[in-house]
A protein has these predicted regions:
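C-terminal scaffold of the Radical SAM
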Residues: 1-183
């Protein structure tokens, strides 16, 4: 999975990304040449100063590169993040709605189908990992801050490395935010 986010270098800079479109394209090509036959590219809509035209261009450029999978996420501003503290010029709700609709239209024209809210794939290339979340397949996270779903229990491991490093062998000692799923 390669995180392009946008094909507009100005948008990338506003996001704090350290790559340009040309560098992303080079990385994508290097992945292909290394033998990766199933690539995902992440894109983001609703970015600062982004408009429908630049979003459509991003979709068309990336779809034209023919990755097997495209994740098209909408930017969500979270409290406590640098973006939340800035006054940003973001697309309004109507423009974001049009971006979402155009995502489906453009990617469908390139042979992708939508199988989740934000995910599009070529036939047979849907991400099994993503589908597992929707079908409640069990998964185990290992390491600091990792998430798991196991035996109808959802939980997160400690985020503090010093405490996690003192693990005593009892899994319960490092699990937090436990939630039992009943439906």
């Amino acid at each position: 999975s390669l995180g392009c986010q946008s094909t507009d270098d100005t948008e990338l800079k506003l996001l704090g990304r350290i790559h340009t479109l040309a560098q992303f394209q080079e990385s994508f090509q290097m992945a292909r040449e290394a033998g990766f036959a199933n690539l995902n590219v992440d894109l983001m809509s609703g970015l600062p100063r982004q408009n429908l035209t630049s979003w459509e261009k991003s979709l068309e450029v990336i779809a034209g590169m023919e990755p097997e999978h495209i994740s098209a996420y909408s930017l969500i501003i979270e409290e406590g993040t640098p973006f939340a503290e800035k006054k940003l010029e973001l697309p309004d709700e109507e423009e974001e709605r049009r971006m979402y609709e155009r995502t489906w239209e453009i990617l469908q024209a390139y042979g992708y189908h939508q199988y989740e809210i934000s995910n599009y794939a070529k036939k047979g290339k849907e991400c099994r990992h993503n589908l597992g979340y929707w079908t409640r397949k069990e998964y185990l996270g290992f390491g600091v801050g990792s998430a798991s779903l196991f035996q109808n229990q959802r939980f997160i491991n400690l985020r503090d490395l010093s405490v996690y490093g003192a693990f005593n062998g009892n899994p319960e000692s490092i699990r937090r935010d436990r939630e039992t799923l009943t439906v």
